[in-house]
Design a protein with these regions (language model features):
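Carboxylate-rich, polar loop motifs that coordinate divalent cations or form catalytic acidic clusters
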Residues: 1-330
Length: 330
């Protein structure tokens, strides 16, 4: 009887201990520093690391090379952004302005576009930010020009960057309106007829911060702004107001903001772990924080990216570990 009682008491402890799973270089990950996490419609997890692109099928990793002719591109200037477009295609873009598309049939990444080298001889990294909008365009941004690559026609349009600032992130509001975060602040803009036009917005125009990440919720029309050592701010388009939550996270840098569900956001930080915020009340609480005294607890607080899958598992790019997975279903 005592034996069975001991096992019953031990069982819940065992379940809690299995909350976290770790994936590192010893498991096949190419590098401990992971920048982006994506999941395709087949179910594979994709990781953009310091060394290249890894695919994980739940058991093992496969590494992919980025080739420009006979030359492998493995420098940090070519490993910067990993996105999945609205049609489910995987794209990798680098600061040198080279765009790769994943070819599922041949299981390779194909170089489909690169900025003309002769136009940027003095700039080793001409692109400060790249992003995919809802209109089938990949944005290649620098301080003077925005190059729009049409993923369907493969045509490239040049748009003057009227901000004259380094762009760090973009969120699309509707077909032609955008929030654009830069090194200097945040702007409301319209892209129409291949012209980017700034739109006046008193509240946003007076916010002088270095924007790291943006998240826009179209249902409640709120923009969540993650800054470098300035915490999180919320711009409400309905009331035209800016709010900073009581737990402002000003002592850490915000790396990523992702929706956990319809009412809550996850806020990843560089040094403070992950926080959870209510989108209505802005109540912010620690959610996933390192516990170095626990054998099977969270094992790091420097989070570059997060991904919440359909099974409610949270995949974290957790330096210097690699990938940490939290599974609350255990």
């Amino acid at each position: 009887m005592k034996k069975w009682l001991f096992l019953l008491l031990l069982f819940p402890l065992t379940c809690v201990a299995q909350t976290y799973q770790y994936l590192g270089v010893e498991d096949g990950l190419s590098n401990r520093r992971v920048y982006y996490i994506q999941k395709d419609n087949v179910g594979y997890m994709w990781f953009l690391t310091h060394e290249g692109i890894d695919r994980y099928n739940g058991k093992e990793f496969k590494r992919y090379k980025l080739m420009d002719g006979d030359k492998e591109l493995n420098s940090l200037l070519n490993l910067n952004w990993l996105y999945i477009d609205p049609e489910g295609t995987l794209w990798e873009i680098g600061k040198k302005g080279k765009i790769f598309r994943y070819d599922r049939i041949h299981d390779t990444f194909e170089l489909v576009y690169k900025l003309p080298i002769e136009d940027f001889k003095d700039l080793p990294a001409p692109i400060t930010f790249s992003w995919i909008d809802h209109n089938n365009h990949i944005w290649l941004c620098n301080e003077e020009t925005i190059f729009l690559y049409n993923t369907r026609t493969e045509e490239v349009t040049h748009v003057k960057n009227c901000l004259s600032e380094a762009i760090n992130d973009i969120e699309q509001i509707d077909e032609s309106h955008y929030f654009i975060g830069t090194e200097m602040g945040i702007h409301h803009a319209q892209l129409k007829n291949n012209t980017l036009q700034l739109l006046p917005c008193d509240k946003l125009d007076n916010v002088n911060i270095q924007v790291n990440d943006l998240h826009f919720d179209p249902k409640i029309r709120k923009l969540f702004i993650g800054a470098f050592e300035r915490g999180v701010m919320v711009y409400d388009m309905n009331t035209k107001t800016i709010t900073q939550p009581e737990v402002s996270l000003k002592d850490v840098s915000i790396s990523r903001i992702k929706p956990l569900n319809a009412k809550e956001l996850l806020i990843a930080t560089d040094g403070g772990g992950i926080y959870k915020m209510n989108v209505d009340t802005y109540q912010t609480v620690p959610f996933i924080v390192a516990d170095y005294n626990s054998y099977n607890g969270m094992n790091g607080n420097s989070i570059n990216d997060i991904y919440i899958d359909d099974e409610e598992r949270i995949w974290m790019a957790n330096y210097p570990i690699g990938i940490t997975i939290q599974n609350n279903r255990y």
